[in-house]
Amino acid sequence: WAQVVSQENLPNTMTMLPFTPNSESPSTSEALSTYSSIATVPVTEDPKESISPWGQTTAPASSIPLGTPELSSFFFTSAGASGNTPVPELTTSQEVSTEASLVLFPKSSGVASDPPVTITNPATSSAVASTSLETFKGTSAPPVTVTSSTMTSGPFVATTVSSETSGPPVTMATGSLGPSKETHGLSATIATSSGESSSVAGGTPVFSTKISTTSTPNPITTVPPRPGSSGMLLVSMLIALTVVLVLVALLLLWRQRQKRRTGALTLSRGGKRNGTVDAWAGPARVPDEEATTASGSGGNKSSGAPETDGSGQRPTLTTFFSRRKSRQGSVALEELKPGTGPNLKGEEEPLVGSEDEAVETPTSDGPQAKDGAAPQSL
C-alpha cells in the first residue's frame, strides 16, 4: 500500500492506493528531474496540523528544503502514527499537490526485502521511516548516519540511514569419502552456510540460512583379475609348446627314414665312376669253332665241358667269377697246347693250375703228363 498526502484542499485526508513491492518504479534521478519544482519549493507545515501524541501543543512552522538527494528517500508522517506499525511508502499521483507533497521512490531490486523499520523520535514528535533491509552475499558495511542541522525556529531532526547489510558468513564443510580396497569412489563435498542475525535498531532481526549440497556420482568399481585366470593361461601355453615339440620330433623321424631309403639307393650306385656305370655284360658267347673243338677234344664227360648236340648248343656264363668260367678257360688253353709247341708249356702250366687238369692228365700220352703233374703237386 502507498500513502498519498495532499494538503491542497483537505489537510487531514489520507488516500490509500495499492502498491506492489516488486513492481518497477522510477529511480531517484527521474524523480528529481520530474519534480524539480518540488525540490526547490520549501514545505511549510501548519502549526495546527503538528499534533504531538503527548499533548495538543502546537509546533512552530518550519521550512525544510528538499534539494538534498539524501533526504528524498524519507518522508514525514503525522505524530499520530504508531512506532511499531510500518509506515507505507508514498508513490506518485496526479492528485498530489506540487507545494506540500513528499514522494518516496523505492529502489527496485529483485532480492526479497524485509518490512520497513520505523524509528520514532519523541522529542520532535516526528517519525522517520527508512527503507527496508536487503540481504546480499558479501562483507557487511558499517551503518551510515546522516544528521541534519537544526533549522531556524525548527526542532532538531535526526535521521539514521542503515546501509544494506550482507548476509551471514558462509561456513564450508567438506567431507571426503575414502576409497575402499575394491571400490574407487569420488569425494563428496557438502557446503553448509550457518545463519546469523543482522538487525538495525528498532527493526526486526533478519535470519538467513542456505544449504547447498552437491550430489556424489555413482562409485566406479573395478573387478580385479581372478587368480585362476593366470593359471589357465599358463596351462594353455604349456599345451601349445608340447604340441609343437611332438610335431618337430615326428618331422625328424620321417626325415631319418627318408635318409635310410636314399642310402640303400646310393650303395647300389656306388660303382658309378665318371658317369659310367658298371653293369652285367650278360651271357658270354663262345664262337662255334671253339665249341666244336672243345667237344671233340674232350672225349670223356669228366672234363666238365658241355656236350654239344647236333643242333650246336652254345655254353652260357651266369657270373663273372665261377668255376664254369675257369673250366672253359682251361679248355681253351688245352686246345692251344698241341699247336704252340713245347716252349710254351712252361708258361702255360702255372697259368692253368686247377684240379681239373690233374684229372685230365692221365688221359694224355706218355711221360709228358707225368712231368706236368709233378710240379703241380709240389
From Swiss-Prot:
The chain crosses the membrane at residues 232-254. The modification Phosphothreonine is found at T276, T316, T361. The keyword Transferase does not apply. Its main location: membrane. GO terms for cellular component: basement membrane; cell surface; cleavage furrow; external side of plasma membrane; extracellular space; microvillus; plasma membrane; PML body. Residues 1-7 form the signal peptide. The modification Phosphoserine is found at S268, S311, S322, S326, S330, S354. GO terms for biological process: apoptotic signaling pathway; cell surface receptor signaling pathway; chronic inflammatory response; defense response to bacterium; leukocyte tethering or rolling; monocyte activation; negative regulation of cell adhesion; negative regulation of T cell activation. Keywords: Cell projection, Glycoprotein, Membrane, Nucleus, Phosphoprotein, Signal, Transmembrane, Transmembrane helix, Ubl conjugation. Residues 8-231 are extracellular. Residues 255-285 are annotated as: Required for interaction with EZR, MSN and RDX and for co-localization to microvilli. Residues 13-33, 265-378 are annotated as: Disordered. Residues 255-378 are cytoplasmic. The keyword Magnesium does not apply. A motif (Nuclear localization signal) lies at residues 259-273. GO terms for molecular function: heat shock protein binding; Hsp70 protein binding; protein domain specific binding; transmembrane signaling receptor activity. Interacts with SIGLEC1. This is Leukosialin. It comes from Rattus norvegicus (Rat). The lineage of its organism: Eukaryota, Metazoa, Chordata, Craniata, Vertebrata. The gene is Spn.
